[in-house]
Amino acid sequence: MSDGKEELVNRAKLAEQAERYDDMAASMKKVTELGAELSNEERNLLSVAYKNVVGARRSSWRVISSIEQKTEGSEKKQQMAKEYREKVEKELRDICQDVLNLLDKFLIPKAGAAESKVFYLKMKGDYYRYLAEVASGDDRNSVVEKSQQSYQEAFDIAKDKMQPTHPIRLGLALNFSVFFYEILNAPDKACQLAKQAFDDAIAELDTLNEDSYKDSTLIMQLLRDNLTLWTSDAATDDTDANETEGGN
């Protein structure tokens, strides 16, 4: 007999407490495949699970890529690093493809409220962005375009339907600006987008919802930190910008 939804959700929560994010993601994937629209709690569990699963591979990929570049001159070591990087890349691509399939097949079509639609389109932009980080050539052009389209669609809905202080709208602006800075190498556009989102939120601080006050102000701080980083001469290639974690 297949597990019920409640049991799967409880198993995901247990896995989260044990920091076993692969198990957490597997449970939430099954919940999603049951086909019903996810509650806010379920949506956040899914997001946190996959953010951690993919985050571990993104981090590994960066470390191995750096080692690979530093082993020039030692062909054997460089080949070993290259093969290991390709192994991690395959894992990362498979995870991203998993999430994108869930988004296209279940989550985006079932999203009723604007908030849910923006959340999932932002997520789609994020996972195409992660693919862009490890892609090259025509492959990269394709995933970059899909990432930008997803972010832009989410951004248009958010501007029309959500308060500038809403944490999901702010989180979208944060990640979309990181996309411009890191993927498109467009620092001016990244700064403009981040500054506009920050200024719009500041202008409407009185609309801050008590429940999301902490989330909203945290993301505003991250926007400001990125702006400081991006506009300073100290910004270096190996300094990572802030982006939202799962659950925002």
Swiss-Prot record:
Lineage: Eukaryota, Metazoa, Ecdysozoa, Nematoda, Chromadorea
Main localization category: cytoplasm
Swiss-Prot/TrEMBL site (Cleavage) positions: D240, A241
Gene name, Swiss-Prot/TrEMBL: ftt-2
Function of the molecule: Required for extension of lifespan by sir-2.1. Required to modulate lifespan, in concert with hcf-1, acting redundantly with 14-3-3-like protein par-5. Promotes nuclear export of yap-1. Negatively regulates the transcriptional activity of daf-16 by sequestering it to the cytoplasm.
Subunit structure, as described in the record: Interacts with daf-16. Interacts with sir-2.1. Interacts with hcf-1.
A GO term from the CC aspect: cytoplasm
Keyword entries, A-Z: Cytoplasm, Nucleus
Organism listed in the record: Caenorhabditis elegans
Cellular localisation: Cytoplasm; Nucleus
PROSITE patterns membership: 1433_1 (PS00796), 1433_2 (PS00797)
Membership in a protein family: Belongs to the 14-3-3 family.
UniProt xrefs under SMART domains: 14_3_3
InterPro entries listed in its UniProt record: 14-3-3 (IPR000308), 14-3-3_CS (IPR023409), 14-3-3_dom_sf (IPR036815), 14-3-3_domain (IPR023410)
Source organism, top-level taxon: Eukaryota
GO MF, one example: DNA-binding transcription factor binding
GO biological process terms held by the UniProt record: dauer larval development; maintenance of protein location in nucleus; negative regulation of gene expression; negative regulation of protein import into nucleus; protein localization; regulation of gene expression; signal transduction
Name of the protein this chain belongs to: 14-3-3-like protein 2
